Amino acid sequence: MEGGESTESTHNTKVSDSAYSNSCSNSQSQRSGSSKSRLSGSHSSGSSGYGGKPSTQASSSDMIIKRNKDKSRKKKKNKGAGQGAGQAQTLISASTSLEGRDEEKPRPSGTGCVEQQICRELQDQQHGEDHSEPQAIEQLQQEEEEDQSGSESEADRVEGVAKSEAAQSFPIPSPLSVTIVPPSMGGCGGVGHAAGLDSGLAKFDKTWEAGPGKLESMTGVGAAAAGTGQRGERVKEDSFCCVISMHDGIVLYTTPSITDVLGYPRDMWLGRSFIDFVHLKDRATFASQITTGIPIAESRGSVPKDAKSTFCVMLRRYRGLKSGGFGVIGRPVSYEPFRLGLTFREAPEEARPDNYMVSNGTNMLLVICATPIKSSYKVPDEILSQKSPKFAIRHTATGIISHVDSAAVSALGYLPQDLIGRSIMDFYHHEDLSVMKETYETVMKKGQTAGASFCSKPYRFLIQNGCYVLLETEWTSFVNPWSRKLEFVVGHHRVFQGPKQCNVFEAAPTCKLKISEEAQSRNTRIKEDIVKRLAETVSRPSDTVKQEVSRRCQALASFMETLMDEVSRADLKLELPHENELTVSERDSVMLGEISPHHDYYDSKSSTETPPSYNQLNYNENLLRFFNSKPVTAPAELDPPKTEPPEPRGTCVSGASGPMSPVHEGSGGSGSSGNFTTASNIHMSSVTNTSIAGTGGTGTGTGTGTGTGTGTGTGTGTGTGTGTGTGTGTGTGTGTGTGTGTGNGTNSGTGTGTASSSKGGTAAIPPVTLTESLLNKHNDEMEKFMLKKHRESRGRTGEKSKKSANDTLKMLEYSGPGHGIKRGGSHSWEGEANKPKQQLTLGTDAIKGAAGSAGGAVGTGGVGSGGAGVAGGGGSGTGVAGTPEGRATTTSGTGTPGGAGGGGGAGAAAAAGASSSVGSSTPGPSSYPTCTQNINLWPPFSVGITPPVHSTHTAMAQSSFSSAGLFPTFYYIPASLTPTSPTRSPRMHKHPHKGGTDMPTTSQQAAAAAAQAMPLQYMAGVMYPHPSLFYTHPAAAAATAMMYQPMPFPGMANALQIPERPLGSQSAYNKSVYTTTPASMTKKVPGAFHSVTTPAQVQRPSSQSASVKTEPGSSAAVSDPCKKEVPDSSPIPSVMGDYNSDPPCSSSNPANNKKYTDSNGNSDDMDGSSFSSFYSSFIKTTDGSESPPDTEKDPKHRKLKSMSTSESKIMEHPEEDQTQHGDG
């Protein structure tokens, strides 16, 4: 239909006369003869292959009643030409385009109602006048032709049968399509054509749409012959269309151009299977296209206009009398190639009179547009231009053709299915096989580079008619990148020279080309060589490999740069598996580590999931600040401590030669992180080595020495030498230093030991010069060790829930003033050195002198202490601390016989050449010394430094803390005290007294003066718990070794006496108890974080009654009568100790004061209830608990009975106490 429809198809004919009249049916049957289109002999369901049952198929839809059909036929015959033309228009209703041609497609549907028929007839009468007279004349002529062409005898059969057959053939558009077409259409007309269609056509379309048996016509063609309507202007077309029912494969409709293309009469295909006209070899291809096309149509909707597939088949030509005469049987059947375009459509559902709806799936229609394929050549040996179309042929490595373009059919004469599966070697000319071998060699070489193509020499290719064409080919190939094997070769061919025989579709001659056997064997060998060559592995050229390696190296380099940019952060992260549950200790250890006093919050990226790194602890920052301060790392002379005049109430330390951090003020220069403790306070664990005293001990391998003492106290010193302590007690003292410290204690006497410092002693070994390389080395070792410990701690999840408070406490441990700041929760040091050393009073004859730890300084000075004689008679201990000049600063504490007295004092060498020592003993009440040294806190801390205030020394809690987010570490700065009279067994109270780092010893007589408070100042390293968590009385602070605000009571002239009366649980921290006892003496002991190293006491006249403010539930406050003897199993109140007490104190039970410590001074009460007594409330921030979580576990944990219950009163307003403390 591309070339124009026949003029015969432009006539309009009455629907009733053409499609449904007896003459139409008879003429159709007569023309088809004995074909399957004869209505009576149809093989389809029902009669004539279209109807017979109210089926679900498009070709067999129910028809209207024969009576209605017959009446409609008669009426329409009487109406006239105009009515017939209008009805013809109704058949050609819906128009859609298909390959640019107009073709009618039936939409068989259910039978129409009588009302629909009447409505259609009325519209026919109304609009029939609109059509021209020539249309009516042509309609009448067409009717006459059909009546004459058919045999009337067929129409004279039984009228009922004929009418029945005609009624059943209602939806058959084939007779209509042969002779009935609207005048405006060049081919099959349809709605929407611009030429010759008036408004009445649309109305007729609507009429037909409303009626049954609707047909859908195709749009797109016919413009050439539009509006002609003249029979003489008929133009032959070279394509045709047909509609096939997908239910049974029967042809429902064909365009009239089938006569011009294949020679068949107009209705000969109707009722016959389409596949009968397809060549046998192409039927499989046709069937495969049908089966693949149907799912596409169903998936795209009911009317998939674009669901088109194209393929090529050979269709049979008609053997008619005109073409071949009467010798039909003797002539061979001829086939012609056609390109078929398949489109799947669905007929719409229509309502039946019985309300039966036809489903969509059963109304599937196949519209086929067949276009003949002509040869590309017009003259023999035609030289084609460069613009001639190309076609592609693809074959595998074995030479088997796998794909052929449909464009190759007109050039080669083969259909694609004819070539697929055959060897391409069979089509090469035998003389060109050598050329083809070279071509395939090049193909293999080019295959080394993906996408490479090349053009080969022209070669000859065999075509369908037995001739050869000369092809120019551009070759490309695909190589499997994994196996490096050739997958397929694609050739884009262009015909350079045509064949000798122009018609490429002619049959090839039966005679074969005569080739000698030698040539045949040679050709066979070449073909085998080509196939073998194609089967080889494609190797990569060296340059290609180099290029790829270079590209990969560049990509790797860029990737590594990006990676290094990401990893170049300062923090060191350790990737550990995510743990769903973190223990309280692990979580809070990281939390508290993040709020280190010197931590930078703005650049901290660590979280509870990120393991803490050593760099995040600002260790390197401290080192950098240390070197930026340009410290004196060479040995320098320490100032003699005797240059400072003693204060009347205590000792005063000489000022350091330069500003010192609070880390450095506790000791003159203890630098070894191997011992983790210093002589200044043997119960404080070193956490980070940031002192300016250099490295020694375990950290740098400078060696550590241990000195054993016989006192009950333990003295530790750090340095590079060895320290020895001698005594008669059972205590041990460990110390390292360049000098030797000796502590002598005697069992007799309970007096207080006065610490004195003097030059002399053994000559100091030259200390190791502190260098940055040593510190860096130490930094690396500590970082590795810390990460290892952190990995181990992360693995413990189950047991740690019980010990969470204990682990939290470890975060706050402090090893002494000789070391720097380190986040406590990192679990870096979990050895014995990190365990708190708790001392309990000993009330038996074991009144030993203290063991002194050695004093030699590392770098700028050593720390040596005579130790602390904590319990027993106040023996005298001497600690010799070596000075950088080789001199030794000796501190000695002499204990006076009596109750539990502490022995030797502690000698400490100050940093930067400042030499002083601290000596303090616990026995006996004495005046508490005050230290008014101007301490240069470095660096300044956010919590301000409270100026020294001379008042009664008390430990008071602070309820309003200014820095809410900071939890600094403890720094213990002890002060020596000179007891003047024998005392009872000292009671260790944990008060971190903040005084000067180094205090020269004073005379014992100076301690007898009026009580003066030791000025308490905020230190940058002091751990001040958050006041919002809970309020703690100073008595509780004594038990917890925590200073909420280490300031004296400014308004109290008398020292507060701590009663031994725990009233209520600690949870009632918002209430305070004032207990006044008329005791003659009040014992004040400066406490360490864990225990007291150099305890001191404040002697008070018995006439002075001191009121002690204690917290309910705190067993630290003990009345003065109870201080005479410590009850059985009652450890000294400390952070690590339990608040347990057996019966109230009895004065004759000194031997029951047992020390629950091991040989190293490590308390076995670490896992006791005192962990949770303070920190459970600190962490959980619950103020409603009745008692600490763990205090109920041990039956010994009972509240101490007070001797002065009646004198106690509850203070309901703790704010008054806060005013006494000051806001800090």
Curated annotation (Swiss-Prot):
This is Period circadian protein. Phosphorylated with a circadian rhythmicity, probably by the double-time protein (dbt). Phosphorylation could be implicated in the stability of per monomer and in the formation of heterodimer per-tim. GO terms for biological process: behavioral response to cocaine; circadian behavior; circadian regulation of gene expression; circadian rhythm; circadian sleep/wake cycle; circadian temperature homeostasis; copulation; courtship behavior. Disruption phenotype: Rhythmic changes in CCHa1 expression in the brain controlled by the circadian clock are lost. The lineage of its organism: Eukaryota, Metazoa, Ecdysozoa, Arthropoda, Hexapoda. Residues 694-754 are annotated as: 30 X 2 AA approximate tandem repeats of G-[TN]. Residues 1-175, 632-764, 788-807, 874-927, 978-1008, 1094-1224 are annotated as: Disordered. It comes from Drosophila melanogaster. Sequence repeats lie at residues 694-695, 697-698, 699-700, 701-702, 703-704, 705-706, 707-708, 709-710, 711-712, 713-714, 715-716, 717-718, 719-720, 721-722, 723-724, 725-726, 727-728, 729-730, 731-732, 733-734, 735-736, 737-738, 739-740, 741-742, 743-744, 745-746, 747-748, 749-750, 751-752, 753-754.
